Structure formats: structure tokens, C-alpha cells
Design a protein with these regions (language model features):
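Short, charged, surface-exposed secondary-structure boundary motifs
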Residues: 43-52, 106-109, 161-165, 216-227
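Beta-strand-loop-alpha "switch" segments that mediate conformational coupling across diverse proteins
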Residues: 95-106
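Short, flexible loop segments at boundaries between secondary-structure elements
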Residues: 101-103, 157-161, 203-234
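A short, acidic, amphipathic alpha-helical segment used as a generic capping/interface helix at domain edges
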Residues: 162-182, 191-192
Length: 235
């Protein structure tokens, strides 16, 4: 219904991208791209409610392209081969690997933040309080634990709207956190929710940062031109 409405309103539309539509059989896409989190491979998961899958892992065979996301740095060639073997893809299916590249800390409240935070400058005497409201924060947390400073994690459910009590709890935790220097760091998604949260105290705004994330192809693998291959299929 939504696709028909798009075509009706915008008849010149040439491309429609759907998110999380793999299980909708009424839609017959020209290309199916399936994303698989490196830390939660489908071959080690189960159907709901026992696991997280909405479909059998065998449905991977319907994908034209499979992208393994959030790969940690330094994966060995053997690791890539094991993933490929366990997926058991058909010859017509393409397999890609991507990883996150983390940028420098950015203030969530730039007008209230004269304070500059640099992760590389923080030491074991400093503390970082993480605030996440995403489905799988493992990679995010792993990045910060690679530094010498103390890391305290506050994880909320995916798409969480922070309540007054949530904010009050975070404030109290931050105020009692030990460290010569201390900051609050959140994800880009959660930064938007915090920036417009009416309960966030002005006294903490200068200490709140988010870390930009970009996605890059893992160059060490045979197939690393996803965009080019996709354009070939689409014609």
C-alpha cells in the first residue's frame, strides 16, 4: 500500500529502498540485501521467542547480498572463511564485510559546552559514562573499553525515550562517578533524544558528548565494492 502511494504521488520514482522488509513476501524486490551483525550471526541464533530471528536462518538463501556488519578490527583470513562456510551461501550470492569507524567526540549541547573532550587524552584516572538506547551496544562499548579510562555503561532499550526519572538517575550516577575528569558519551541516535529532552539539567550539558560513526568496507576481503555490485544488478 505504501509503495503504491509513493508511485501515485511521485510517478517518476525510479528506486525505493525498504528497511526491515525481508520478511514481507508481498513485496518482490529486485535486490534483497540482508545485514547480519558480526556479534549475532544468524547461524548461532534461533526463532522467536527462544532467539531473535523472525524467520528461519535458512531464509538467508533469499538474499542477493549478505553484509556482515560491525566487524571488529584485525579479523584474520580464517575468520572470514569460517563465516562464509557457516553461512553456506549459493554461488549467485555476494558476501561483504563492514566495520565501524569512530570519529572524535562532539558536544550534544554545543552552545553550552566550552569543555573539549579528547578520548586519547583521557587516562586511567578519568571516567567515561556511556548512555545507550540501541539494540546492540556491544561494538560501541568495546570501542571505549579499548582505552585506559574507567567505563561505566548505562544501557536502555532500543528507541528509548528518556523519562524524568531516567535523567535524574543518570545525573546522580554522573555526580557520584569517581574521576579527575569525567564525561558522558552517547550514540548519535541517542544524542538527538537527549538534546531535545526537557528534563536534561543545564548543569550537565557541558559534559555530554556523542561520537560520530561511519561505515567502511573491510578492504581485506574479496568482495568489497558493494555499491558498484548493487548498481550492476539494478542496471
Amino acid at each position: 500500500k505504501g509503495i503504491r502511494e509513493i508511485i501515485r504521488q511521485f510517478p517518476d520514482t525510479q528506486l525505493i529502498l525498504l528497511d526491515d522488509a525481508f520478511q514481507h513476501r508481498y513485496v518482490k524486490p529486485k535486490v534483497n540485501v540482508m545485514l547480519m551483525d558480526y556479534s549475532r550471526p544468524v547461524y548461532d541464533d534461533s526463532l522467536l521467542p527462544y532467539g531473535r530471528l523472525r524467520e528461519s536462518a535458512h531464509q538467508v538463501n533469499r538474499a542477493d547480498m549478505v553484509v556482515v556488519t560491525k566487524c571488529p578490527a584485525g579479523l584474520s583470513p580464517l575468520s572470514f572463511r569460517l563465516i562464509s562456510k557457516k553461512l553456506g551461501l549459493m554461488p549467485y550470492q555476494k558476501l561483504y564485510y563492514t566495520s565501524y569507524s569512530y570519529g572524535s567526540l562532539m558536544p550534544v549541547f554545543p552552545e553550552d559546552s566550552p569543555y573539549h573532550a579528547d578520548l586519547a587524552a583521557l587516562t586511567a584516572r578519568d571516567s567515561v559514562m556511556l548512555v545507550t538506547g540501541i539494540a546492540n551496544p556491544r561494538g560501541f562499548v568495546r570501542h571505549f573499553r579499548s582505552f585506559p579510562f574507567k567505563v561505566v555503561v548505562n544501557h536502555f532499550p532500543d528507541h528509548h525515550d528518556f523519562t524524568r526519572s531516567d535523567i535524574e538517575e543518570l545525573k546522580n550516577k554522573f555526580l557520584t562517578l569517581k574521576g579527575e575528569r569525567k564525561v558522558i558519551v552517547t550514540t548519535e541516535k541517542d544524542a538527538v533524544r537527549l538534546a531535545y529532552n526537557p528534563y536534561f539539567p543545564s548543569s550537565l550539558k557541558q559534559f555530554v558528548f556523542y561520537i560520530p560513526v561511519s561505515v567502511r568496507m573491510v578492504a581485506e576481503t574479496e568482495d568489497n565494492d558493494l555499491a558498484g555490485d548493487l548498481m550492476k544488478i539494478l542496471g
